[in-house]
C-alpha cells in the first residue's frame, strides 16, 4: 500500500503523522485482502480565514475510488481525522458489501439458468 500524508499550508507535525498512521490501521486491516496497487492520500489543511480544519482522505484501488473529507470549525485536527476515518470505513464497508451482493446475485442467476 502506498500511503502519502500531506500537510498543506502548515508545518509537518511528527506527532500528528504518527496519530494519523495509527488511525489508518483500521483502513489497512480492511484493505489487506484487496488487489494491489492501493494508493492512500491523507491531506491536512487549515483554513486561513476561519478556524476550520480540513482533512481529506482518498483511497484508490483497482475496484473503486473513494474520497472522504470533513471540515468543522472549532475542533482540532485529531477530531476531524477521527471523523474522516470513520466515514471512510463505512464507505469501504458499503462498497465491499455491494461487490459481494452482486457476485451472489450473479451466482444465483447462473444456478437458475442451469436448472431450467
Regions found by a protein language model. Give the residues of each.
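N-terminal, polar/charged subdomain of small-to-medium soluble alpha/beta proteins
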Residues: 1-116
Amino acid at each position: 500500500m502506498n500511503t502519502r500524508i500531506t500537510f498543506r499550508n502548515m508545518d509537518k507535525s511528527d506527532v500528528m503523522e504518527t496519530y494519523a498512521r495509527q488511525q489508518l490501521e483500521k483502513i489497512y486491516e480492511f484493505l489487506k485482502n484487496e488487489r494491489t496497487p492501493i494508493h492512500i492520500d491523507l491531506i491536512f489543511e487549515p483554513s486561513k480565514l476561519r478556524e476550520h480544519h480540513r482533512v481529506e482522505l482518498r483511497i484508490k484501488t483497482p475496484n473503486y475510488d473513494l474520497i472522504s473529507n470533513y471540515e468543522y470549525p472549532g475542533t482540532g485536527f485529531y477530531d476531524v481525522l477521527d471523523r474522516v476515518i470513520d466515514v471512510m470505513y463505512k464507505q469501504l464497508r458499503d462498497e465491499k458489501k455491494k461487490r459481494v451482493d452482486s457476485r451472489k446475485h450473479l451466482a444465483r442467476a447462473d444456478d437458475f439458468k442451469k436448472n431450467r
